[in-house]
UniProtKB/Swiss-Prot annotation:
Role: Component of the NOP7 complex, which is required for maturation of the 25S and 5.8S ribosomal RNAs and formation of the 60S ribosome.
The protein, known as: Ribosome biogenesis protein ytm1
Localization per Swiss-Prot or TrEMBL: Nucleus, Nucleolus; Nucleus, Nucleoplasm
Organism: Pyrenophora tritici-repentis (strain Pt-1C-BFP)
Alphabetical list of PROSITE patterns matching this protein: WD_REPEATS_1 (PS00678), WD_REPEATS_2 (PS50082), WD_REPEATS_REGION (PS50294)
Organism taxonomic ancestry: Eukaryota, Fungi, Dikarya, Ascomycota, Pezizomycotina
GO biological process: chromosome organization; maturation of 5.8S rRNA from tricistronic rRNA transcript (SSU-rRNA, 5.8S rRNA, LSU-rRNA); maturation of LSU-rRNA from tricistronic rRNA transcript (SSU-rRNA, 5.8S rRNA, LSU-rRNA); protein-RNA complex remodeling
HAMAP family: WDR12
Compositional bias of kind Low complexity: 239-252
Gene transcribed to yield this protein: ytm1
Family that this chain belongs to: Belongs to the WD repeat WDR12/YTM1 family.
Amino acid sequence: MDVDAAETKVQIRLTTRDSSLQISEEPNVLLVQTSLTRHKLSTLVNELLHRGDETRIPFDILINGEFLRTTIDEFLTKNGINAESTLDVEYTRALVPPLNVTSFEHDDWVSAVDVLSGVQSGQERILSASYDGLVRVWNTSGDVLATSEAPNNGGRITSLKTAKWLSEKKMVAAGLDNNVRVYKYDDDARTIITALELVNHRWGVEDVAVHAPSNRILSASSDTTISLFSSNAKENPVAPANLLPSSSAASNKRQKLSKPDRTVPARGALATFTGHSSPVSSVIFKPDDATVAYSASHDHTLKTWDLPTSTCVDTRTTGHSLLSLCAIPSRNLLATGTSARHITLIDPRASATQISVMTLRGHKNGVVSLDTDPSSEHNLASASHDGTVQIWDLRNVSTGSQIGEGMQGESVYTIYRQGRDTSKSHGEGTKVFSVRWDRAVGIVSGGEDKRVQINRALGS
């Protein structure tokens, strides 16, 4: 019987979405043995592309849109496909395991990371926010280029929870002292100076989102509200006096007369968005329309906001607290990390009838940060309190077994913290708080181990 299976052949039509890897020779329809596996099909594609051992590319193989993880024969049997059919076989560059490149030590937990790249090759800058209340800028060699000054808040160390680059010379950070701060960064002078304080929240700020072209900033808070600010002080109204520290209330009035000791101007919000009933964990601008925003909350809901009218236009209710959020524009989906240890992909469009399109399982604790692969529309990175960053390919899915959860996927790679015993990855001191995926730098993450860690695929 094994001999018969090995001799069975099937027609395949090879295709790729990568124009640089098109097979120019005819025919594109081939007759191959059904005993072939992904590895052998990858070898076949390299031969058709005339790539030798030194230039060989590892390929993943998809049949009818599903990854091949067995022989073709087993795939046909599992999916009830007749061997007389012509199979559409797509080949795509395999996701190479991201190796640990380096890590940068901090004095306290690293709550957030962001990357500034695309300015000039070799001039990438990494932004980190820490529980010591400071933001730092690093180069990719691990040198601290600049550290922010301690905020003027009575000497209290107020932990930061979030930080984003707004431009080459501006960044935004916020945390447990309820305020959002805009900083000016000078790469030549190696200084980070607080330029503006934005005041509207009564409790800590969990997340910020920025839209550089409009200078707009969104902040999500534990007080259940979302605020909209401008990074230009003059565009914002006067800060609410009842939310200003007593030492700042008077100085706020004197900001135009500030002396060299620099009184930092404080301003209020352009708008406040209410509607969540529990802390708001994450907020983002819609990628193709900055007049729309999405927010995720511990109240289990994902909300869509029309910013010009300060109106909630849609609410999607899930079964768990939502801890993180990112957009996947190519699929018109939003990825949400949950307290239930999985990632739920949601279609936010009003026409969508199903809340959960896909569920990704593999973490052992809450999923608190998400980012997409800038080089692929299919890949996603997630950071969790279980001490890992996991890499997902959204094509690596199967039919879900639970009603209402859509397709189900498993991670393709797991990144552990450098120097950690992987058998104790989700123990004390291992939580990962933030992840960013950058085309030039790689996968950057920060966590409870007081490190910024960089992982990158070999050769990238």
